[in-house]
């Protein structure tokens, strides 16, 4: 543990606070076990309904509940005796709730389900405008996911398959990538300083009103806010300190994030990217490949604990970066014009079509790794890998990255 003595004081303090907040969150965010409680709920649909012989089911967000600690949680709703897909996206019901291993399950009969009026906001207005302008199903689905953070559960099967099998499904999940692109594009519309302020205001508006408030968006927006403040005040910016600081705040105010895969995938992806770039000297191509490998390695063990991982994404991500940037650029311009400026919309759809066709081509033979890795195992592996990245320099960082990935290969069923 000699590396601990070499940690800068500021980083040591932030790391310690993060670990303390994690201990608090693991205790405060744990839901008590419940079984067979009939209570009142208001829920909002978070994905598509799935029809089965016994009824229909879908992921939902709990807007209101008689049990206070269930409010604001995501749950899985099963509607019994349903022979059709319920209309609407908001419902009230008296349901049987069961909580097991921090997961919430609600079941109710179809006659106990009542549709509620829709809550329209600026996000809904812009999404409707986008749907009116874009008729192709796959381009519409890509746009709704990329710009507005629509759940990947709402993607058409072919679109989900193409992005999932090539390892680029993260492109359709609003995260730091999207927040960073919005800031980069808006900040270039005005001169320095004014541009950074415009970019920050745009990101705050985008994160607050246009996309779901999921952990990656909150983390990325918080880190960007602190970076802009540091930049405008001519202060030194410590990326690792800010990552741990934002993580500390998120776990303190939203302790249930400590049980969220979304939070940890975002956290470790950014941590590995920052550690890969630390003490690394190389050209732009080398840095792009190392960043892509770092982001992949920082998420692969956790993903492997519940799904397959696709190594081809390490190459596809930097190769497709120009097209992804073009899609974001014309997407932001389309948002600014309320999708009323045809050239930007046409170029946005053209970029999206090219991305989709390239991924469709590679999806049929993209290799997939299915490792038998447990979540606890994945966390230990990621922590050890992060320590290895911190103490190495330059291309020596390939060693800890390689060890993490080789471990996943050795764990293949």
Curated annotation (Swiss-Prot):
This is Uncharacterized protein aq_1618. The keyword Protease does not apply. Keywords: Cell membrane, Membrane, Transmembrane, Transmembrane helix. The chain crosses the membrane at residues 10-32, 162-184, 189-211, 232-254, 259-276, 288-310, 325-347. Its main location: membrane. InterPro entries: ComEC_N, Competence_DNA_uptake. It comes from the Bacteria. GO terms for cellular component: plasma membrane. It comes from Aquifex aeolicus (strain VF5). The lineage of its organism: Bacteria, Pseudomonadati, Aquificota, Aquificia, Aquificales. It is found in: Cell membrane. It is a multi-pass membrane protein. Pfam families: Competence (PF03772).
């Amino acid at each position: 543990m000699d590396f601990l003595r070499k940690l800068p004081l500021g980083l040591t303090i932030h790391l310690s606070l993060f670990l303390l907040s994690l201990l608090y969150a693991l205790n405060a965010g744990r839901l008590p076990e419940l079984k067979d409680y009939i209570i009142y709920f208001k829920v909002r649909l978070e994905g598509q309904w799935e029809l089965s012989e016994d009824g229909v089911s879908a992921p939902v967000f709990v807007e209101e509940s008689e049990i206070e600690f269930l409010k604001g949680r995501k749950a899985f709703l099963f509607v019994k005796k349903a022979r059709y897909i319920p209309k609407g996206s908001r419902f009230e019901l008296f349901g049987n709730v069961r909580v097991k291993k921090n997961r919430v399950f609600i079941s109710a009969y179809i006659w106990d389900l009542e549709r509620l009026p829709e809550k329209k906001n600026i996000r809904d207005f812009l999404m409707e405008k986008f749907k009116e302008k874009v008729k192709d199903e796959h381009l519409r689905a890509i746009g709704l996911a990329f710009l507005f953070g629509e759940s990947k559960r709402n993607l058409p099967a072919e679109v989900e398959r193409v992005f999932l099998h090539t390892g680029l499904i993260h492109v359709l999940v609003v995260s730091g990538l999207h927040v960073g692109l919005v800031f980069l594009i808006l900040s270039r519309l005005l001169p320095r300083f004014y541009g950074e302020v415009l970019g920050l205001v745009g990101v705050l508006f985008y994160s607050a009103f246009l996309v779901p408030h999921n952990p990656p968006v909150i983390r990325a927006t918080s880190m960007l806010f602190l970076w802009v403040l540091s930049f405008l005040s001519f202060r030194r910016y410590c990326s690792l300190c800010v990552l741990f600081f934002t993580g500390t705040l998120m776990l303190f105010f939203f302790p249930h994030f400590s049980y969220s895969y979304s939070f940890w995938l975002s956290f470790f992806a950014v941590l590995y990217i920052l550690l890969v770039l630390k003490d690394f000297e190389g050209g732009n191509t080398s840095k792009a490949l190392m960043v892509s490998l770092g982001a992949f390695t920082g998420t692969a063990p956790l993903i492997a604990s519940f799904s397959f991982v696709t190594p081809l994404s390490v190459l596809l991500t930097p190769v497709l970066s120009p097209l992804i940037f073009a899609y974001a650029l014309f997407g932001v311009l389309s948002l600014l014009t309320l999708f009323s400026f045809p050239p930007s919309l046409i170029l946005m759809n053209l970029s999206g079509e090219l991305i989709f066709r390239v991924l469709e081509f590679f999806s049929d033979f993209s290799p997939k790794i299915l490792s038998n890795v447990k979540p606890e195992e994945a966390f230990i592996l990621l922590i050890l890998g992060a320590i290895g990245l911190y103490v190495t320099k330059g291309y020596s960082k390939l060693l800890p990255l390689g060890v993490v990935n080789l471990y996943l290969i050795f764990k293949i069923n």
